[in-house]
Amino acid sequence: MDGDDLIASVYRKIEREKALITAASNMRQSTDNPLVQQRVDANIRDGRKNIAYLEEKMRELQLRRMEHEGGGSPTDKRLPPNPEAGPVPPQKDYGPGYGGNEEYGDASGAYPHGGAGSMPSGAPYADPRPFAPVPKARPNYTKLDLIKYDTQYLGPKIQLMLSQLEFKLSVEKQYKAGIEKMVRLYQDEGDRKSRADAEGRRIESNQKIQLLKQALKRYEDLHVDIESTDTPDDESLSTPNLRKPLTGLLTLRIHAVKDVDHAASSRFSRGPETFIVLKVEDTIKARTKATRIDRWQDETFNIDIDKANEIELTVYDKSGDRPTPIGMLWVRISDIAEEMRRKKIESEFNASGWVSADKMEHGGAPGRPDTAGGAGSAHPSGPGGPGAAPSQGYGDGSAGAPAGNQVMIDSWFALEPVGRIYLSMSFAKQLKDRRPFDIGLNRQGAVRQKKEEVHEKQGHKFVTQQFYNIMRCALCGDFLKYAAGMQCADCKYTCHKKCYPKVVTKCISKANYETDPDEEKINHRIPHRFEGFSNISANWCCHCGYLLPFGRKNAKRCTECGLTCHSHCTHLVPDFCGMSMEAANQILETLIRTKNHNKTASVSSGLSGRTLRPSGTPQGPQDSAAMAYPQKPVESPYGAPQRQPSAEAVSAATNSYMPPQSPTAAARQQMPPRTSSSAAVAAATVATGMPSPQQMPAEQNRPMQPQLPTYDPKAYEPYANAPQGMPPQAIQHAAPAGYGMPAQQPAMQMVSQQPPEAPQQPKVRIGLDHFNFLAVLGKGNFGKVMLAETKSTKRLYAIKVLKKEFIIENDEVESTKSEKRVFMIANKERHPFLLNLHACFQTETRVYFVMEYISGGDLMLHIQRGQFGLKRAQFYAAEVLLALKYFHENGVIYRDLKLDNIMLTLDGHIKVADYGLCKENMWYGATTSTFCGTPEFMAPEILLDKRYGRAVDWWAFGVLIYQMLLQQSPFRGEDEDEIYDAILADEPLYPIHMPRDSVSILQKLLTREPELRLGSGPTDAQEVMSHAFFRNINWDDIYHKRVPPPFLPQISSPTDTSNFDQEFTSVTPVLTPVQSVLSQAMQEEFRGFSYTADFA
């Protein structure tokens, strides 16, 4: 539909609403019945609200047409042409700065107004004005706000209800079909009682279907098919880490219903009796008393919730033998919990007078009316409304008392298809480790996504995935409702656990899909004709199983068979147009079974006359070379190495983890492939101690032969001399030569930046007997950090001790090796603000990192002792920034920036420590997807399960500056889920007197869109260094430590540990005995770990 047709359609909708209002007004004048008048008044109110919404859409369409014809400005489309027309419906899930055309909107990422102060030359200068225009903050509403009767956000509500009602309608139709089968079954059996009961449920199901159709028609009539190109999808629909089922106590009080369409009754009878049924996950939990006045005096229910997602309220009228449903409401329990979290934060910040950045910019008053209104106070006309409940909660909700006892959500909610219901409700989550809400900063451990067991099937790497949304199986087409299923780690193919063994279609994200034998494919090769369509109902992707986003931006439909999918999934859907996936898989299974049956005799006879290689025999030179240097796949899915016909799954797994090909490796891969079976490969793997292709690290290449390669200084030149500004393609090939080298090489050879003409002196092999342990400084997931001194020189070191058993059990071998390589990068230039490594060694049970000892403690300890001033926070931020800049210039993202990991030296400067979550080979444009980090510092793109790049470090840098300036976190909650909700939904608040430069840098670093975030461009740290917050910083003086530090930590002696947590320092510094014995293959995993730095 083009622009003119859309405008005409909206005009017709407006005229229809006006006609309905006119008819309603005439009816009101012609009746004296108060109930009819009340219902007509509600219709008129709704009609006026609809007209305001449609007129706003009309203005938006007209403005777009003017822009298209060259008569408007592209930036004007975000402003309402007529501000008096009421609130502008926001774009769905519109984030701060999403798609703005202002300072960060252009593709070049340039900052046109020039720099100020001491800025690095050649940087893209930031706007020196402290409150230069930034991308607009999004309207702050929750999903619960959208289902409230008086919501201002009609546009997002229409989108939400269209998808929700379509899904509810499809489920109800399935339920009705099942009931009809039961009716026929009981009729055949002659069971009259059961048949009558089933017949009653069938009638009720029919009535609910009519209600749902009526509600759906209402929203479809209001929907305007406008799709903004920069409107983000609702990622919460396809994010497995969000919206988990909750357990706790739900408190619900039902006060009244209003404006509902009551069931018809006879002329002389009394009105129908009305009651409400409450269901939790389709199970009836409560029922109100019947009333004829639409109000209830004391209907309060306390319901224990056990891992549930949704509650359903159904209003019934009983005028005859059977009750008739007249209105329905669905509320997600997670939305209730999220609303209560926001109310607690509002109460705290309203009392303190803090405001969001946009209110500070426009001189607004303290408080958050956008969310305070959304939280809901008692409706003025609410009967018996507990008006004191919200104020009581606002006063006490942040005092650490259980939230469910004080804070209540009190509001009118919209019933479907018509009417409203007045509810007061709260939800107290059951938490294992509840965090006090009213205290400042505290230590938090990092989290890392555990590696799931992989089930290989036809090239797919299926892992068990718990889904918290309604999913659809790609094989059988049935729903997975809040259940665990199987999902391919590569192509995201999703199906039931019971269905994944039946999957015969191959993972076509693999490059070898087109080279597979024809007999393993089906001859039904009719490609789908996918075209974009406007998705205004509940449709699921036929490949990944997620609900398609609303609108036309990311939805495709086959014009022939009607199959729907995401735009990015179209190339993964097999060419089975006109055939269901289940039928296609049955045909393929039959073909393969027939083929295997025909080959059984020939295979048996072939094996009888064949000499098999013993499992322990070393492989030939071709195989050993190929295994010694596994190559990472190029991003393109084409041009993969030849596969081994007898080990399709092994080949597919190998292809997915192999690094970029070098010329020699490419030549190796052109050799004829071996035909050894996968069993022989596995046997050789065990015998030689080599990891399987799946376990082969992407950055660590390890030869299988024991002889060590010779040191070649030329191999290090590309990495040592690579200019910082070289393009990503050049960096990608030059960088691995510096530190992605075989692990068996002597440790001193891996320090690649020493001049080759300086001869390497032989070093004493360092071991456990060289040290005395003095104290425990900290503990982590797999071990502890201990203070130790050398027996000979009495020099102090911090030694990180990790148990090999835990490393292997948690599949962290490669992570440990990567941590060592990042230490090498830090050692390369002895960076002043990075912790240096002196040595590594190992025993039979543990590995040890010998690091420099920083006796001043970490910044978390010091900020708990007292708030940092602006100058002190700015000083530490500048030094941390240079550390991040160095990491990024060397292709490393840090991913765990926090106060706990920033150590303070005795001379007052910082050292960034703990490289356990660092990721290598992350140059500009490179992305990864591991879910890891410390909850309060994790960027939104990590939480949304998106691929992310080095911009996540700049988000964490913004959280760090916020904590140093304000001594609290911008995103808080009582558990990790609440913190994640805050990161995705809340706007950080600031004291009204906070300097504008400080607010500006935080606002730009804490931008949810990574491509718009300060520091996300190709010049990386230069963008942040150019900001006005660092106007007075001389970066050369900071790097060379010529700036006097603002604070010097004090110790009484070199071994004084008073700057470390007493919880750890009070523990006796001993290594606990390890009873388990590691096999030779396990020990082989740590070959080449030992290392001694040249400056040690």
Curated annotation (Swiss-Prot):
Domain AGC-kinase C-terminal: 1031-1096
Catalytic residue positions: D896 (proton acceptor)
Family statement drawn from the similarity comment of this UniProt entry: Belongs to the protein kinase superfamily. AGC Ser/Thr protein kinase family. PKC subfamily.
One of the GO biological process terms: positive regulation of cytoplasmic mRNA processing body assembly
Domain Protein kinase residues, every copy: 771-1030
Ranges of Polar residues composition bias in the record: 599-622, 746-755
A GO cellular-component term linked to this record: site of polarized growth
Name the record gives this protein: Protein kinase C-like
Listed SUPFAM superfamilies: C2 domain (Calcium/lipid-binding domain, CaLB), Cysteine-rich domain, HR1 repeat, Protein kinase-like (PK-like)
All copies of domain REM-1, residue ranges: 1-67, 148-225
Composition skew (Basic and acidic residues), residue ranges: 67-79
Organism lineage string: Eukaryota, Fungi, Dikarya, Ascomycota, Pezizomycotina
Matching InterPro entries: AGC-kinase_C, C1-like_sf, C2_dom, C2_domain_sf, C2_fungal_PKC, HR1_rho-bd, HR1_rpt_sf, Kinase-like_dom_sf
